[in-house]
UniProtKB/Swiss-Prot annotation:
Cofactor binding, note field: Binds 3 Mg(2+) ions per subunit.
Gene name, Swiss-Prot/TrEMBL: lysX
Compositional bias annotation for Polar residues: 19-33
Cofactor: Mg(2+)
UniProt protein name: Lysylphosphatidylglycerol biosynthesis bifunctional protein LysX
InterPro entries according to UniProt: Aa-tRNA-synt_II (IPR004364), aa-tRNA-synth_II (IPR006195), aa-tRNA-synth_II/BPL/LPL (IPR045864), LPG_synthase_C (IPR024320), Lys-tRNA-ligase_II (IPR002313), Lys-tRNA-ligase_II_N (IPR044136), Lys-tRNA-synth_II_C (IPR018149), NA-bd_OB-fold (IPR012340)
HAMAP family reported for this sequence: Lys_tRNA_synth_class2
Residue positions binding Mg(2+) 2: 1093
Chain residues that bind Mg(2+) 1: 1086, 1093
Pfam families attached to this UniProt entry: LPG_synthase_C, tRNA-synt_2, tRNA-synt_2_TM, tRNA_anti-codon
Cellular compartments annotated: Cell membrane
Biological process terms in GO annotation: lipid metabolic process; lysyl-tRNA aminoacylation; response to antibiotic
């Protein structure tokens, strides 16, 4: 019936439902393990604990998370109090009846009111355990709003009212008797009226169960009780007449002593009444146990239910480490109406405990939770959840429950796991001890274990268990060796004599994870055995395809951790002390410390409930479900006992589910729409839906909308240049369609251009123009075959004789006239921009031409192209902030290169006299008109040359690139003209041929300042000049850095025509040789055009002693916190000590060269620049 055996009745909600709640007490994952919890962060859950209270307690607000969401129960009514009032009334009588049956003193104290109540109001015999048990069940059922309890109580009141009415009508009673009968009749009438008016408050049903089996048990117990009672009466008859002894015994055993004692002449000994009632109670208790167990067994998982759950796990089970435990067979299940999510649960003492998160599609979780809450309401259960993740708790909260964090689950990431380091010292020492004892570890899937060997494994697991029963509910599977669990993992520790001393069994967590289910060890196993198994599993996880391991759950982890911290508050210390005290029985602290030593990722899990006032009842349900409190005759099913499948008919009708519980065909589930079912279907715009519908019609007609390709004979440009009547086939995208009935015109575009195609019914080999119009949309890719001709207006056209669809466009293209106007949209959907924008395609072509021209120019001069590492152990070659990444294999940080310079110089040492690299570089800096964090960089080195040699070389590279992209050595510059028709933006060509100006840095700054400076100008003077010119500087900068700042603010940004600025201060050029004749400057130049630096060149520093001194200065800056300073690269310095020839080096930003040549920003010239996240 799902009614608890408790006598107390909880408080009431205003809406009339019994208060519902859940509190998760400690629960076991295995024999010695407390329940576990998992892997989402607690972001998104609101918290009620204030910072002040948190500080006072000395614990984090997360550990006392309480949320108060909207109510999930029925609305209020005028008679919401009736079930609780009826339950409390009957419960008080049940309690007093039980106490009177036990204690003669209480029986004497309540004798007078008991007799009055028994005679006129309600059956209240002096001693009867059976009647006390019946009333207790009735009180619990009334409180749970069971409709059958309402019917029983109403029938009792009606029958009592009829009896009182008959007595009143008969008359002849004393004044006291008349008063009692009239008062009783009035009370009964009022009770009947109240019960009838409160009928709708008793909505709860009773679950199906073995009613006839329970009745048979009661009947057998009753017969045995009557016979035994009759025998006792015969032995101790007292004053009871012989012919009344059997009836007296039957009245006390099965009649609940309801018959008037005056009907019997005489009495047996008083102690016999209690024994007779006890016999009746035993019969009822036995029947109730059979009924309750049958309710659970009959409504537990069926094979079809488990098969459906496994299908959902295969489709959606990658996120929840507890998902596989939903296949535990002593649970029941409720599905969302779509079948795409479900919740497994068990009912204990009137509490419906959901096991963790819903299983299935996250989008269908609210449906599943709603179905579960409706089920709880239907049967009058209090809803509760154990072990929900943050995402699951948020879903339950949105459905009206409250979330409380219980603790954290330990998650190991094998990619980050290592035994080295001081924090792993304890584990490392334990593993060493186990290995010295000769232990080895064997890891296998259950499917790879022979039946006889698995039988031995089960025997060992049972013999090593230190409790009488298996523990666990939400975080334990409850079975071992089942064929359906073939993917489970078994880890065994084996001694030198090939004897198994310990084992771990782990269930699948998606396809790449495992979750601990069972942990056993022999009493003879040495210390460190468990640590050895866990470490070996983590270290060899990659070979098993495992990327995450869920270990045990640490209940109240935050309390242990924060209560032990320095400065913890008194309440936090007291709370930790209580947990340590209770750890003597429930191993709370032991589990926390046993998990903590592996340095896991701690992930919170939550309990959810509806109202805090019944937390004790839900706590009792939790410990019963987890096995810490074992009820008599309880059992845990390892086979299917359910007879009533919960799978939605829509899913069951597919025939994909298996009666043995094995997983269904996942591809079949996808085909029947389980991945896109009712209620949460993919929402698409109307135009997209129309195109999807058209695609389905094409497929149903046998047309492949995405066929295998075949090369066309001509591009569009080639077709337009072909002779009249030439046979051609072209492929492209439909940009426009004009339908004139029997004749249809379309614009077809490929990379080379756009042309008109003409479909005339009279010239098509098969079909008609209408077929083309019906099958295609703008944006579709088609292949056209025919001959070249012209339309009536003389427009060159392809006269189509045949066509086929080669790619269905399922989304509409942007506006055919305006294209994509939003710059961000053009960046994010570059593929669309290229499809509709001819200028974007021209930029891609221009960029390709620039890259090709640069390579060809260098190849013509005998340069060798190489590739150097992008992932580097040190960041060097330039002063810039690097990107940092991490390599798991060696457990160390790496940097994305900011420049390939140091590796290319190693090649120069090796004798590669002319070398270049054209590749990607990365700098963790700003994003603007001319900067992108990822860019293309050219670095070239020529032996026996200097920086002046590269002035001509660089100019030649850029001019050749401009020639290749624009057809002439010109650069395109944006211009804005204002006229009568408004402002017009356009690009204007600028000639960049010939020789470009060369100026020294100090001369250019002097001209800008109007005051002469040189390399000998003092720092104080330079600072005064900065102040006068409004140029900012830092006090720690030297003179060279101040000069560079003046150059960037006054010279670089004002430069228009390409200009080489040479001879920079030595201090800002750490990899450049000093000038051969000028003190204080280095042989370096920067090329600037229109305010943007395009490249730089050095006479490379080849003196290894001076190079070491400069890099040591840079490393000191890096150690002092400068993120852009270069680190000391000993490998590079050692290579330099083998002597590098005099070399000139060039570095040039290809993206900026493309900007110069095309007149566009860096974001426009890159196919896919970095875009801000949505």
């Amino acid at each position: 019936m799902g009614v608890g055996l408790h006598l107390t009745v909880p408080g009431l909600r205003r809406d009339g439902r019994g208060v519902q709640s859940n509190s998760h007490d400690t629960s076991s994952k295995t024999t010695a393990d407390i329940s576990r919890c998992p892997q989402h962060t607690d972001a998104g859950l609101q918290r009620a604990a204030t910072p002040g209270i948190s500080r006072l307690l000395g614990i984090s607000s997360r550990s006392v998370t309480l949320t108060k969401p909207r109510s999930a129960t029925r609305g209020n009514s005028r008679y919401h109090w009736v079930p609780a009032a009826a339950g409390w009334t009957v419960g008080v009588i049940a309690t007093l009846s039980l106490l009177a049956s036990v204690s003669p003193l209480i029986r004497w104290i309540i004798k007078v009111p008991r007799e009055f109540i028994n005679d006129y109001l309600f059956n209240f015999p002096d001693t009867n355990f059976a009647w006390s048990f019946v009333l207790a069940l009735l009180a619990a059922a009334l409180t749970a709003r069971k409709r059958i309890a309402w019917l029983v109580l109403l029938a009792n009141m009606v029958l009592a009212a009829v009896v009182n009415a008959a007595e009143i009508a008969a008359g002849g009673n004393t004044a006291a008797e008349s008063f009692g009968e009239n008062l009783g009749f009035a009370v009964h009438v009022v009770a009947i009226v109240v019960l009838v008016l409160g009928y709708r408050e008793f909505w709860a049903k009773v679950r199906r169960g073995a009613l006839f089996r329970a009745a048979a048990v009661w009947l057998a117990g009753a017969v045995v009780g009557i016979v035994a009672s009759w025998g006792l009466v015969e032995l101790f008859p007292g004053s009871l007449a012989p012919d009344e002894r059997l009836g007296y015994a039957a009245n006390r055993v099965v009649g609940f002593a309801l018959a008037d004692p005056d009907l019997f002449t005489g009495r047996p000994h008083v102690f016999l009444n209690a024994i007779f009632g006890l016999f009746g109670a035993f019969a009822l208790i036995g029947a109730a146990i059979v009924l309750f167990l049958s309710q659970r067994a009959d409504n537990a998982l069926t094979g079809e239910d488990e098969s459906a759950i496994r299908g959902l796990l295969d489709l959606y089970g990658k996120d929840d480490s507890l998902g596989y435990f939903a296949t535990r067979r002593d649970k029941s299940v409720v599905f969302a109406s779509s079948g795409r999510a479900c919740i497994t649960y068990r009912v204990e003492v009137g509490v419906c405990l959901a096991s963790g998160d819903p299983v299935g599609d996250h989008r269908a979780w609210p449906q599943a939770v709603d179905a579960w809450l409706r089920l709880c309401q239907t049967y009058g259960w209090a809803p509760g959840v154990m072990g929900a993740s943050s995402q699951g708790a948020q879903t339950y909260r949105e459905a009206g429950l409250t979330a409380l964090e219980l603790g954290d689950e330990a998650i190991l990431r094998p990619a980050d796991f290592k035994l080295s380091g001081p924090e792993m010292r304890g584990v490392r020492q334990a593993v060493t001890r186990a290995r010295r004892a000769g232990l080895t570890v064997r890891i296998r899937r259950h499917r790879d274990i022979a039946e006889d060997e698995m039988a031995q494994t089960i025997t060992r697991a049972d013999s090593w268990r230190d409790t009488e029963t298996e523990r666990g509910f939400s975080m334990a599977l409850g079975r071992l060796g089942d064929p359906a669990d073939s993917d489970c993992l078994l880890v065994e520790a084996i001694d030198p004599h090939n004897q198994v001393l310990a084992m771990l069994s782990l269930v699948p967590w998606g396809t790449t994870g495992v979750s601990l289910d069972l942990m056993r060890r022999s009493p003879q196993s040495p210390n460190g055995t468990i640590e050895l198994m866990v470490s070996e599993l983590a270290l060899h996880a990659e070979s098993l395809g495992i990327t995450r391991i869920s270990l045990n759950f640490a209940v109240f982890r935050a309390a242990f951790e924060q209560g032990a911290q320095l400065g913890a508050g008194p309440v936090a210390r007291l709370w930790r002390g209580l947990l340590v005290f209770f750890s003597r029985w429930w191993q709370l602290e032991t589990l926390y410390r046993s998990n903590m030593k592996y340095q896991p990722e701690w992930v919170p899990r939550y309990a959810c409930y509806e109202d805090a006032r019944v937390i004790p009842r839900v706590g009792v349900a939790s410990v019963i479900a987890e096995g810490f409190l074992v009820l008599p005759f309880s059992r845990r099913n390892r086979v299917h006992t359910g007879h009533h499948p919960a799978v939605p008919e829509r899913l069951a009708a597919t025939g994909l589910l298996h009666h043995d519980g094995s997983a269904p065909d996942v591809s079949g589930l996808r085909q029947v729409g389980l991945t896109n079912g009712d209620g949460v279907e993919r929402r698409l715009p109307e135009q997209v839906r129309v195109r999807f519908d058209k695609l389905e019609k094409l497929r149903s007609s046998g047309i492949d909308a995405f066929p295998v390709g075949r090369p066309p004979s001509h591009t569009v440009a080639q077709a337009l240049a072909a002779d009249h009547q030439a046979s051609v086939s072209v492929s492209g995208r439909i940009m426009r369609i004009r339908n004139y009935g029997g004749v249809l015109f379309a614009q077809l575009r490929d990379w080379s251009g756009e042309m008109q195609v003409l479909l005339d019914n009279s010239r098509l080999d098969q079909g008609c123009a209408a077929d083309f119009n019906a099958a295609t949309d703008l944006g579709d890719l088609v292949e056209m075959t025919g001959h070249m001709g012209a339309s009536k207006t003389g427009t060159p056209s392809l006269i189509v004789s045949g066509w086929r669809l080669i790619g269905k466009c399922l989304r509409p293209l942007p506006n055919k006239w305006k294209g994509l106007l939003d710059p961000e949209a053009r960046v994010r959907t570059r593929y669309l921009d290229l499809a509709v924008n001819a200028e974007s395609r021209a930029l891609i072509t221009a960029r390709s031409s620039v890259l090709r021209a640069v390579r060809e120019t260098l190849f013509a001069k005998g340069f060798v192209e190489v590739e150097t590492p992008i992932l580097q152990q040190l960041h060097g070659g330039a002063t810039a902030r690097p990107f940092v990444t991490h390599i798991n294999t060696y457990s160390m940080d790496l940097f994305l290169r900011i420049a390939p310079e140091l590796y290319l110089k190693r090649l120069c040492v090796g004798g590669v006299e002319r070398v270049f690299e054209l590749g990607r570089a990365f700098r963790n800096e700003g994003v603007d008109f001319s900067h992108n964090p990822e860019f293309t960089l050219l670095e070239a080195y020529q032996a026996h040359a200097d920086y002046l040699e590269w002035i001509d070389g660089c100019r030649e590279l850029i001019q050749n690139a401009a020639q290749a992209a624009n057809g002439a050595p010109i650069a395109m510059r944006p211009r804005t003209d204002k006229g009568s028709d408004g402002t017009r933006h356009h690009l204007e060509p600028v000639d960049i041929s010939g020789i470009w100006p060369v100026r020294t840095v100090h001369d250019a700054i002097s001209e800008a300042l109007g005051e002469r400076i040189d390399a000998d100008t003092g720092l104080t003077t330079l600072r005064k000049l900065c102040d006068a010119a409004g140029v900012p500087y830092r006090t720690q900068w030297d003179a060279g850095a101040v000069v560079l700042e003046l150059y960037e603010h006054l010279v670089e940004c004002r430069t228009e025509q390409p200009t080489f600025y040479i001879d920079f201060p030595t201090s800002v050029s750490p990899l450049t040789r000093p000038h051969r004749s000028k003190r204080g400057v280095a042989e370096r130049w920067d090329l600037v055009a229109w305010g943007i630096e395009l490249g730089t060149a050095y006479s490379e520093l080849t003196d290894p002693v001076e190079q070491r001194r400069r890099l040591q200065e840079q490393s000191l800056l890096a150690a002092g916190g400068d993120p852009e300073a270069m680190e000391l690269d000993e490998d590079f310095l050692q290579a330099m000590e083998y002597a590098m020839p005099p070399t000139g080096g060039l570095g040039m930003g290809i993206d900026r060269v493309v900007m110069l040549i095309t007149g566009r920003s860096i974001r426009e010239t890159l196919p896919f620049p970095l875009a801000k996240p949505h």
